[in-house]
Amino acid sequence: MAFKYHKVAIVGKHYKKEVSQMVETLYAYLQQQGLEIIIENDTAADTSLVNVAIASLKEIALRCDVAIVVGGDGNFLKASRLLALYSNIPVIGINKGKLGFLTTLAADDNALKNDLYAILKGDSSVTKMSMLKYRVDNNLRAPLEASIALNEIAITASRGLMFGLKVFIDGRYAFDQRGDGLIVSTPTGSTAHAMSAGGPILNPNQNSVVLVPICSHSLNSRPLVISDESVIDIYITDYNDPESVLSIDGRHDTILKAHQKVTIQKARKKVTVLHTKDYNYYDTLREKLGWSKVLF
């Protein structure tokens, strides 16, 4: 059976020795399979490899059939989100970090080679991860790479004071909130910051978005799951003379003032992730997050 993916990119976490060693091992293995390999610029610079083809993330997205991302979940988030902005290139995650919730292939040498071989032959399962985009006060000038989130868009207090939000969904008034902020999360992000704030876990294939209050000053404030086709308008009120911060996937902070409006909706692009054929999302929930474990 011929390989389905012939031009393979490797993207690793910068300045991490164990990742660089894994990249070198991967390169040798893929070369043995007769595949064409391109390594991301910074990733290649961290290795001892010479005379290898290198490229930026944008070039990789446009030139390669598949990208292998080596590192932790944070590195996977950053790389896969940027790759998806430029093409529909599928991504494979190899865990060399701590949790490994998104990077689902273990770095064990023999098992990894077998798993990679099967996936590159096309014997895999696929998850399509939706993303969110935002704009402030209808300003469309923000750089694309700084306005798209794979996990969540969060509006939080920049100082130790609660602040107020007024939320509209599809042009209809939904609720007011005073507290430490609000998280608007994708299904992928529902197991990250949103879960820590008390939000529900959403299946990655669910066409939903969840709004999760952060430390709301109310006994009846609860997370809200809505269609990912909805448009969310969030207004910063003047309560407590606020200065709040908008962040995407924990990065690219934007300072917000009273009366500014943040509009959030589903992005056109999705991240395509390849797993082994027997991948089970619920296994990952149990093994990585201790979900639904019997205590006695």
UniProtKB/Swiss-Prot annotation:
Keywords: ATP-binding, Cytoplasm, Kinase, NAD, NADP, Nucleotide-binding, Transferase. Its EC number is 2.7.1.23. It is an enzyme of class 2 (transferase). It comes from Francisella tularensis subsp. tularensis (strain WY96-3418). Pfam families: NAD_kinase, NAD_kinase_C. Its cofactor is a divalent metal cation. This is NAD kinase. GO terms for cellular component: cytoplasm. InterPro entries: ATP-NAD_kinase_N (IPR017438), ATP-NAD_kinase_PpnK-typ_C (IPR017437), NAD/diacylglycerol_kinase_sf (IPR016064), NADK (IPR002504). One of its GO terms (biological process) is NADP biosynthetic process. It catalyses: NAD(+) + ATP = ADP + NADP(+) + H(+). Its main location: cytoplasm.
